[in-house]
Amino acid sequence: MSDRPSSAGSASRRGTRLPVRTSVALAAAAAARWASRATGRGKGSMIGGLVAAKIDPEIMRRLAAGKRTAIITGTNGKSTTTRMAAAAMAELGEVATQADGANMDAGIIATLTLTRTAPYAALEVDELHVPHVSDAVDPEVLVLLNLSRDQLDRVGEINMIERRLREGIAQHPSTTVVANCDDVLVTSAAFDAPNVIWVAAGASWVGDSVSCPRTGEPIVRSGDGWRSTGDENFRRPTPQWWFDDENIYGPDGFSAPMTLSVPGRANRGNATQAVAAAVAMGADPAKAVAAVGTVGEVAGRYGVHQIGNHSVRTLLAKNPAGWQEALSMIDQDADGLVIAVNGQVPDGEDLSWLWDVRFEAFETMQVVASGERAADLSVRLLYAGAEHTTVPDPMEAIASCPPGRVEVLANYTAFRDLGVAMERAARARKGEQ
């Protein structure tokens, strides 16, 4: 339970007059949003955030003042966990949170701009942005999910991110850190913090934590545990929260059945961290568990769409760890599987990670390689022994599958572009009716 001030403090701030610069920034952001929507260029939230920050560089801090905020970060699972945390916190009051996963400054500012009176916030934040966003919003809780290679040409060395997070956490000693003790890099980032809630959230991908981030010596694993051979004190902490295939377990003997609307063991770990964060903010544990179970489609992830004679479920994966987890969610009994890979800047143009993903799991399933980098994917599938065809356009790839259920697994821009194409197709069908 938090001992910080309740939301009453923020309520009193709602009547506080904002500086002129901030008021002008908010008005300009609203105008930018309207213009973006009026011209059909999008929802306008991002451009609104960019405009507001340009006019008032302090606007994030000013809009977050008085809010009790939880930040959620990590390489994978940020959007889903943020949605779960917001749902679990909702019993406490209105929660400001991103609807679209926009996790850098402009998206965060846009969210705070649109929900100024909310006394709570659950903010998804890109790993590299956590230190300065924390300085601006002074989070009550920081959730650290996992750390692994993301985009090799964007981030470079994952240990650098761990060090920056560790340094950022040190600047906020009153923040409660909800950390995944199964992840070596996350544990290192949180290890020195005075207030840590350890969660056994799982770590199916361990390829980026074979050596100790603090000493460089090997990490030795045994069962669920791990330890550094270079520092006898640096080892897997004892978790206060954990889960199994049916239940969630917490402090003081708490346990409850946990049934989720999203697939995969990784999401059970995400849900456990979301519950731990909400309880740290003051939520009732049983109500928090029930709330995370209501979260289904998240920014298009896990959504099911009817396209002609195909029922299409979409999954997003952005890096080796995410791909490996997403592959385990694929329904092997589906009538078709489309894997779409692009190599644009937001995806990371270095696709060498394809060789780290175990596509051998689809030796018995008909796969369609798609996306701008379908040829690269095709080579990887060939070496994996996965029977496949190559259809670069994802919509055409779906159409090439037998009628019935089709699983689509795509990286970031391929997922985004497919979503736009499916919306366009849906509008066209409505126009024909």
Predicted regions and their residues:
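Fold-independent oxyanion-binding glycine-rich loops
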Residues: 75, 99-100, 123-126, 146-147, ...
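Buried hydrophobic packing segments
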Residues: 85, 89, 108-112, 271-281, ...
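Adenine nucleotide phosphate-binding catalytic loops in nucleotide-utilizing enzymes
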Residues: 3-6, 10-13, 17, 195-321
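Residue-level signal for inorganic ion chemistry
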Residues: 145, 178, 270, 274, ...
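A short, flexible N-terminal coil/short beta segment enriched in small residues
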Residues: 58-87, 259-261, 277-279, 289, ...
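Phosphate-binding loop of NTP-binding sites
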Residues: 3-9, 13, 17-198, 205, ...
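ATP-dependent carboxylate-amine ligase
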Residues: 1-45, 65, 279-284, 290-433
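Short, surface-exposed amphipathic charged segments that create phosphate/polyanion-binding patches used
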Residues: 112, 158-159, 208-219, 399-407
